[in-house]
A protein has these predicted regions:
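Helix N-cap/beta->alpha junction signal
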Residues: 65-66, 139
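ATP/nucleoside-binding phosphotransfer catalytic cores, i.e., glycine-rich phosphate-binding loops
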Residues: 192, 196-198, 217-302
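Glycine-rich beta-alpha junction loops
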Residues: 11, 138-142, 207-211
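Short acidic/glycine-rich loop or secondary-structure boundary segments that cap or lie
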Residues: 143-146, 199-200, 211-216, 238-239
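Catalytic core of DAGKc-family lipid kinases
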Residues: 16, 80-203
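Short hydrophobic segments within beta-strands
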Residues: 7-9, 89, 207
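Glycine-rich phosphate/pyrophosphate-binding beta-alpha loops
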Residues: 205-217, 279
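ATP/NTP phosphate-donor binding region
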Residues: 1-64, 71, 75-76, 103, ...
């Protein structure tokens, strides 16, 4: 009998939906031994380690939550080294991984003609040390720093409301942007793959999935074991932000294909890095490497 681990966060804004639409329905599944992993309020790395120790070959992990929950499941599977299949359902704010896999509800995973495919995630290395795997995108700089807004109590309360969650989140992001965009340097002077980047560059992005922050369109680089797309831009400039957003929503996020990026700062720097909404700030950073991971995921894709 196949073991199914449902990963969820009881403190998430849509936990009641998860309880009714996933946890309850899982009890009716035939052929599965259902277990649950409840994300704790400990550090994300602690959750990754705990979940990884539970996994065995042949397991299926179902992430029922937002991208933050999904990234715990992804990293736990890859850390375990076991032959585990991942499925993702969208119960968060942006749900970029679920959008990439096109799994919208319980039936898409268990009762449809969904396929198991290989998924090639991004790997983030900071000063030679592994940081995290990311499935859909990585940002460094201003956009990465802005995700800290979602951890503030005021924002968490607004995101628990049944209606207006998305509008509220975008409004708060816009307010943060205009308040902070000229306050400091988000990306100190750096070279990308040996090439000095333009002054006032505020953001680096690596894109691997179909979407980024819900509304920005990506591609299918996650199916490629070697290449993804990258972009460096001056998004503290409002005009350039509008141009980028317009192109990304109407067409596709602009970018250049790469088989790996090395970011080298002229001086040791403090920078924010985020992967699918989970961010961290690093001090005295000299180099950051983004590349396709040496391990691939098995995923259920609709």
């Amino acid at each position: 009998m196949t073991r199914l681990f449902i990963v969820y966060n009881p403190r998430s804004s849509r936990y009641l939906d998860v309880k009714q639409e996933v946890l309850s329905r899982a009890k009716e599944l035939n052929g599965y031994l259902v277990g649950k992993y409840e994300v704790t309020d400990a550090h994300i790395d602690d959750n990754i380690t705990k979940l990884s120790k539970l996994l065995e070959d042949g397991d299926v992990v179902l992430s029922a939550g937002g991208d933050a929950t999904a990234i715990i499941a992804v990293n736990a599977i890859l850390k375990s080294g076991k032959d585990v299949t991942l499925s993702v359902l969208p119960y968060g704010n942006f749900n970029d991984l679920a959008r990439t896999l096109r799994t919208r509800n319980f039936d898409d995973v268990f009762l449809s003609d969904a396929l198991v495919r290989n998924f090639y995630p991004l790997e983030i290395i900071v000063d030679g040390k592994f940081f995290r795997y990311s499935t859909c995108y990585v940002t460094i700089g201003m956009m990465a720093e802005s995700v800290g807004l979602y951890n503030e109590p005021k924002m968490r309360r607004k995101l628990k409301k049944k209606f207006g969650r998305q509008i509220s989140s975008y409004t708060q992001l816009a307010s943060w942007y205009f308040k902070n965009r000229r306050n400091r340097i988000f990306l100190p002077e750096f070279k990308l793959n040996g090439v000095l980047q333009p002054k006032k560059s505020s953001d680096y992005a690596a894109v691997n999935g179909r979407s980024m922050a819900r509304v920005m369109k990506g591609g299918e680089d996650y199916r490629d074991p070697q290449f993804f797309r990258h972009q460096v831009d001056r998004l503290a400039n409002f005009y350039r932000l509008v141009v980028l957003m317009s192109r990304s929503i109407l067409s596709r996020i602009p970018g250049t294909a790469t088989d790996g990026d090395i970011i080298e700062f002229t001086n040791p720097s403090t920078v924010a890095i985020q992967a699918e909404g989970e961010g961290a700030t690093f001090e005295n950073v000299k180099t950051i490497e983004i590349r396709k991971g040496k391990k691939c995921l098995k995923v259920i894709e609709n």
